[in-house]
Each structure stands twice: as structure tokens, then as C-alpha cells.
Amino acid sequence: KGKNPQQYGIGFKEIWEIDEKKHDEGLVMHTAGWPLDNKTYGGSFVYHAENKQIFLGYVLGLDYQNPHLSPFDEFQRFKTHPSIKKILEGGKRISYGARALIEGGLQSLPKMYMPGALLVGCDAGTLNMPKIKGSHTAMKSGMIAAETIFSHIAEKRSLSIFEDKFKKSWVYKELYEARNVKPSFKWGLILGIIFTGIDQILFRGKLPFTLKHKHADHETLKPANKMPKIEYPKPDNVFTFDKTSSVYLSGTNHAENQPVHLQLKNPNLPINFTLDKYDEPAQRYCPVGVYEVQIENSIPKFVINSQNCIHCKTCDIKEPSQNITWVTPEGGGGPKYGNM
């Protein structure tokens, strides 16, 4: 109550082993924009790690408007930029993963306490978007939670003191100063960057107003016939790859014959409504091809390949009718990320 709708992004990450001559341990690269258009929020990271490895990724805001857009293919296309391609040339992709990130910031923080539980870290949404980091704020919120629980047990104090402690911490101050960055990109990449420069460099995040998130991510898609189609190049299997080979590198696995953990509230909606209005965007926003529309005897059929799911939860967030619910699968199945 009284909060803005939460905002999300889908983050992709690959680990590459590259030519030793191109490796510079500790080097950090960040980019914004390309290959996305001016109206779509996104950016990349390249981190040179140990053992000739780099961590390469792209984060794309799930408030995008074009249902023809494929976040996975935008990430693959990003790797064809000359500055990135020259790093990867002669290298080998060894791991792949994807995950939804909470990007709403201070305006979208939910109530963080309830009977018997506290919300901390990314469950609450403490990611600092301008810094592209959240592990430090997550750890601090966990420390505040520990202090709160101790007071609750030892002094019989209410868990509501958690929010009081949180608001007095440096985490709240940091999120307050970063609060206007993400919503400013609703004006487009160029204006968003200009505003962010003014807000963060000149005013240090202390402008006397707070921009709002007006729409949830599932509300932003426009009808497919109103938006331009996007033709993505076929993967070259050197720099760019398909979803099938990528899901293999995620190590995902689910026990056979278990109940499908991607549940449809209305099983007829994907074909009877979403396919016609939005060209069924689940075919594209899923980073591993869980959802397909297959034609059988000239009749379209919505297929869920739940065994491929890497638990990114993008479908639960972006589905325009909120018809898909992600629930925990049986048997501890899912991706095996290892060094990711």
C-alpha cells in the first residue's frame, strides 16, 4: 500500500575462457543502450576474472513495449559489437544463465516485516541500480534483520522496528540517493542519461522530488500489430548461440514426470487471447525456450517445456495477463550454476 509497482529486469550472464593475451584480470567494462533502441532500458557488463575467464552479461528492463523483442537474442546480438567481439575472438563459452532482477528501488520497497518473517536483500529489492550492485545492501539488511530478531526474542520487541532500523541505516540513504535513476529512463536512453548525470553528479541524488514508477512490467506491452517486427540473425555458434545449446550450459535438470511447475490460471488464454493480441511473447521473453506455439493439424497449441526452466521467473513477471504462475518444482530441480 502506498508503494509504486515493482520493476524488474532480466539479466543474462555467460562465462567465457578467452585468449590469455586479451585477458586483463580486474578490468571492468559497463555499457548502456546498444543493441536496444532508445526507448528500451538496458546495459551490459564485462568483468575480467581469474584463470583467463571473463563474466559477460546484459540486463534488459522488463518494462519494454515491443512484444516482438527477444531479450535472449538482444544479448546474443550485443556480443557482435566490434569492441566485444575482439575480446571473445578465439575464446570459448563455458557457462550460461539468466535471472530476473528487482530494479524498482526505494519507491517500490514493500512492507519488510510480517508475523514471523522479515524481507531482506533482493527479496525486498535493495539493489542499487546506478552502481549495478546489491550484495552490500543485501548483507547490511541481513545484519539489521539479525539485530531485529535478537531484540524481538530478548526484549519482546515488535518486528516492526526492522523498518525503523532500516530507514536509519546507510542502505536507506544509498537507495534514496539512487531513487530517481531507473524511472528517468522512461523518457528514453538519451534523456535518461542526461537526467542521471544531473541527478547523481550535480545534486548527489538529493533533488527535491521523487519520480514514480507508474506501471507494472506486465502492463507495458503494446499490441503486436502496432509494433515493428524484429528479425534476429541466426546464431553463428562462435559468438552467438541458440537457446537449446545455452540451456545445456546452464546445467538445468528436473525429474521426469513431475507436475509442471509453470502453472496456467487459464489454459485457453495463450491461444485465445495472448497469441492474437501480442503474438504470444512468452516464446521470446523466456531465455531458454520453455514456451512454444506449435501447429498441429492447422491448429495452434501452447506447449510448456518445463524441463528446460532455469527459474529466472521472467514469465511470472512479464506475462501480460498474469496468467503464468511459477511455483517451486519437485525434487530440487533447476539450474546448476557452479561458478556463475
Where are these regions (language model features)?
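Residues forming the flavin
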Residues: 1-210, 256-258, 269, 274-289, ...
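Long, low-complexity segments enriched in small/aliphatic residues
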Residues: 193-253
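Terminal low-complexity tails and localization/encapsulation signals of metabolic enzymes
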Residues: 234, 265-270
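Intrinsic low-complexity, disordered N-terminal segments enriched in polar/charged/small residues
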Residues: 255, 264-265
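Short secondary-structure subsegments characteristic of cysteine-rich extracellular domains
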Residues: 302-310
